[in-house]
Amino acid sequence: DNNVLLTGDVIHTDNQLSYESAAFVMQGDCNLVLYNEAGGFQSNTHGRGVDCTLRLNNRGQLEIHSANSNTPVWVYPRSVNTVRGNYAATLGPDQHVTIYGPAIWSTPAAANIPRVRNVLFSSQVMYDNAQLATRDYSLVMRDDCNLVLTKGSKTNIVWESGTSGRGQHCFMRLGHSGELDITDDRLNTVFVSNTVGQEGDYVLILQINGQAVVYGPAVWSTAA
């Protein structure tokens, strides 16, 4: 997805993350620039490399690499107290880039599937057949109270919460501890991911590899 950078992904020269009018661009002059309506952000690395690329490492840090050097041109945040794992940088509706992680929950990895876009942030909810969607995949909070991950057709179920018929007018919410829960209209909890992290901001990303993954808490943001 063009608004998400995951650990192991690479943004090449003159490519970008984008969300509506905002863009996070790895420019040809080796400068990383966030163009938005709130002052933006830049790495101030123009002229310090050639054919530069942007990566997100397994400590939740952004790295700029030059084709003519084995040492990163730029690493940010410079000092982090994070564990190794899988992180996610998202360009969100606030027009800022925020790094979340490490991943604390996911649907099972699908086998032999190609490696499209949507995210749910802490405190946001999904209900009445609302969904996160990618090229081939959809994560749908169905009106029968079942949370379902499908590929292609609505009947091709990759994963489900198994809560069909267990409540009425159910909604799914991502909490500020990274826990996903499904609740009915009487506020009875019918499903919980049982993945409680430290208090903070989390994000659920439906990735293009067919996994829905919760990352967090947020470890850095251009809004800081």
From Swiss-Prot:
Disulfide bond is among the record's keywords: yes
GO molecular function: D-mannose binding
GO BP annotation list: response to other organism
Domain of life: Eukaryota
Gene3D superfamilies recorded: Bulb-type lectin domain (2.90.10.10)
Stretches assigned to the Bulb-type lectin domain: 2-111, 117-222
UniProt KW Repeat keyword: yes
UniProt keyword annotations, A-Z: Disulfide bond, Hemagglutinin, Lectin, Mannose-binding, Repeat
Disulfide pattern: C30-C52, C145-C170
Subunit-structure text: Heterotetramer of 2 domain 1 and 2 domain 2 chains arranged as a dimer of domain 1/domain 2 heterodimers.
Role summary: Mannose-specific lectin. Has weak agglutinating activity towards trypsin-treated erythrocytes from rabbit but not from human.
Other comments on record: On the 2D-gel the determined pI of this protein is: 5.18, its MW is: 48 kDa.
Protein name: Mannose-specific lectin 3
The organism of origin for this protein: Crocus vernus
